[in-house]
Swiss-Prot record:
Pfam families, per the entry: Fer4_7
Record-listed E.C. numbers: 7.1.1.-
Protein name: NADH-quinone oxidoreductase subunit I
Subcellular location(s) per record: Cell inner membrane
Role played: NDH-1 shuttles electrons from NADH, via FMN and iron-sulfur (Fe-S) centers, to quinones in the respiratory chain. The immediate electron acceptor for the enzyme in this species is believed to be ubiquinone. Couples the redox reaction to proton translocation (for every two electrons transferred, four hydrogen ions are translocated across the cytoplasmic membrane), and thus conserves the redox energy in a proton gradient.
Biological classification of the source: Bacteria, Pseudomonadati, Pseudomonadota, Alphaproteobacteria, Hyphomicrobiales
Family designation: Belongs to the complex I 23 kDa subunit family.
Length: 163
C-alpha cells in the first residue's frame, strides 16, 4: 500500500506542485529587501553607529575630561588628554581620540558619560580605504556631533525613559 501511495505522489508531482503554490504565494507579497544605497531601512533610536562629541547650545563642548569613557572602554580604543583647570574650576580635553579599528561599538562610553558628551550617532556609512581614516581625532568627533546633533538629540529623548 505504501508503494502505491508513493507511486501516486510521484505521478502527480505532489512536491513539485506544492513548491509552485508556495512560490506563487510569496511572489505577490511585499518585498523583504530594499534597494540599498538608493533606499535605506529604518534605524532604531538605540542604534550604535559612528561616534560623535556633542556641544552645548552655546557652542561649548560638553566633555569635562573626566576620562570615564577611557576607563570603561573594554577595547582601550579611547585616548584622552585633559587640559589644565580653567578659572571656573572646569577642564576640557586637549586631545580626544578614538581608534575605530579597535572599537567594538559596545556603547559603554556613552553610558558612562555623565554629561552625554560622547554618543554613538545614527551614521552607519563610514567605510574608508585606509586604516588611518578610522582614527578619529577630537575635531572629527566634534564635526560628527555638529552634523548629527538634531538626530542625536531626538534619539536620546526617545531613549530617555529607558536610561
Amino acid at each position: 500500500m505504501a508503494s502505491l501511495s508513493q507511486a501516486v505522489n510521484s505521478l502527480f508531482l505532489k512536491e513539485f506542485v506544492g513548491a509552485i503554490f508556495l512560490t506563487m504565494r510569496h511572489f505577490f507579497k511585499q518585498k523583504a529587501t530594499i534597494n540599498y544605497p538608493f533606499e535605506k531601512g529604518p534605524v532604531s533610536p538605540r542604534f550604535r553607529g559612528e561616534h560623535a562629541l556633542r556641544r552645548y547650545p552655546n557652542g561649548e563642548e560638553r566633555c569635562i575630561a573626566c576620562k570615564l569613557c577611557e576607563a570603561i572602554c573594554p577595547a582601550q580604543a579611547i585616548t584622552i588628554e585633559a587640559g589644565p583647570r580653567r578659572n571656573d574650576g572646569t577642564r576640557r580635553t586637549v586631545r580626544y581620540d578614538i581608534d575605530m579599528v579597535k572599537c567594538i561599538y559596545c556603547g559603554f562610553c556613552q553610558e558612562a558619560c555623565p554629561v552625554d558628551a560622547i554618543v554613538e550617532g545614527p551614521n552607519f556609512e563610514f567605510a574608508t580605504e585606509t586604516r588611518e581614516e578610522l582614527y578619529f581625532d577630537k575635531q572629527r568627533l566634534l564635526d560628527n556631533g555638529d552634523r548629527w546633533e538634531r538626530e542625536i538629540a531626538r534619539n536620546l529623548a526617545l531613549d530617555a525613559p529607558y536610561r
